[in-house]
Amino acid sequence: MHGLIVNQLRQFVVRTHGRKLWNRMRADTGVEIAEVPAIDRLYEDADVVALVQAAAAASGADAQVLLEQFGEFLAPALLRIYAPILRPEWRTLDVIQHAEARIHRVVRRQDAQAAPPYLTATRSSADVVEVNYESPRRLCAVARGIMHGLATHFNERLDIQQPTCLLRGDPACRLVGRLIS
């Protein structure tokens, strides 16, 4: 997993549950990740999964809920980092619609080992975006959280339905985001 994501996971855990929990997660799992993970390297997916499971166990939160909250937390950082390649007039649904072409392709070009999820997004109407999410990591909860985080950033409200999900055995997650007026 990309170091930026792991670094943001650390920031999320520290901000929501304290530095002590982050250090305890690292100790309990035996995962060898620095106190502050480097953003310019890749981390083993299994290590990150172990950290998330440890955070869920220690906080008493459901892992999927925790991942969705992390996605919401992550959205503003992603917007700051990728602002130069996003159009200034774009809002929530526009950013979601163009995430694959504008962000994920750039990430893959910059680092051949980076493996962001594959997204296919289409607008079925002015206020609806439909996203197919495919990734062996099966972190659709993070994607949902990012979508909510984008809406919060743009002072919009977004209802997300998920008719299919990798975690339920479907071949892909389908996320349908509808702006609420």
Residue ranges and their predicted role:
Residues 10, 14, 71, 100, ...:
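Generic solvent-exposed, charged/amphipathic alpha-helical segments
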Residues 47-141, 164:
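Amphipathic interaction/junction segments at domain boundaries or subunit interfaces
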Residues 22-60:
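Long amphipathic alpha-helical segments
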Residues 32-38, 74-78, 171-174:
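Short, mixed-charge aromatic SLiMs
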Residues 17, 29, 59, 151-155:
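A broad structural signal for alpha-helix termini and local helix breaks/kinks
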Residues 1-37:
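Charged, compositionally biased N-terminal leader segments and the immediate start
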Residues 128-181:
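C-terminal non-catalytic interaction appendages of large macromolecular assemblies
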